[in-house]
C-alpha cells in the first residue's frame, strides 16, 4: 500500500455535495433528520431510555489493505479501541518535530487567532489548530505512511485530515479535560455521519503517570453514550477550554469503568497513540514539573465527510472540521 505523496494541505479535486448521491438536504438538519434516522442521537432534552446505544459501524474496516499495522495490532485496536506504538519516531526526526512545535507555539501572531486556544487562567497557548496548514513539516507528517497509512487500514479508505492540532499541557498549570467521545462532538456539531474516523496522537514529550496523560476506557468504543443538554450557540468557544456539553453521565461512566477499567498509555517521546473516534477518554491536570505535548491528527474517510450538524444550529468553524478540499491560504 502506498499513501499518496500529495500533501494533505494542498488542493485536491473531489466531488462536491451536489455531485454526490448522498448529498445532504439543503433545508438543514431538521429536514435531514426527517428523512434519515439518526443512529447516534445526542444533546437530548430528556434522559435517554437506554444508558448507551450499540455501535452501528465496524471498527477496523481495512484489514485487506497493506500498511504499517500488523494483524495483531489491528486485533488489539478492534478489541480495545486504541493502540499505542512506542518509539515510532526517534533521534533527529523527533528533535526536529519538537523544535517545530516550539516555533509554532511561541509565535505571537497566533495568540489572538480563532485557531489558537489559551489556558483558561493565562495567555499561554494550550492548543493550536490547523497545524498541517501552518507547518509544511507537519503537513508532510500527516501524509506519512506510518501515520496516514495506519489510519487507512483502520478506516478502510483514503483518509483526509478532519482536524489537526498541537496540544501543550505545561507543568503545574496544565488543566485536565472531561470524559467525552470525540465522535459525539463531531457528529452533533460538525455533522460527521458515521464512525469512520480515527485519531493519531504523536507524543512529543515523555508521558508518565504524573503529567496528565490521556486516559481511555478500553471497549467503550463499542457503545455510543447519548448526552443531555442542547448545544449552546458557538459552543466551541468555551468547550475547547472546558467541556461541559457532550459529557457522558456519571452513571454511564461508572458502569463502563466497572466493566472495562481505565488505561493510560505511557512511554517515551516519539510514541504514537491511535484511538477510535468513539473511545471515551479524558485527562487529569498536570501537577508535575514536566510539560506534556503532542501533535494530533484526526483522519476521516472521504465518503464520511461532514454534512449538516445533527444537534447544532450550524457547523463549527473549518479550523475544527476541515473539508477534504480545504485550502491552506486562510491560515497563512
Predicted feature residues:
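Internal hydrophobic scaffold segments of catalytic domains
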Residues: 90-95, 99, 198, 204-227
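Generic beta-strand structural signal
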Residues: 157-164, 175, 194-202, 212, ...
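A short secondary-structure junction signal
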Residues: 175-181, 188-190, 210-216, 225-229, ...
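Double-stranded beta-helix
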Residues: 209-279
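Catalytic core of Fe(II)/2-oxoglutarate
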Residues: 251-316
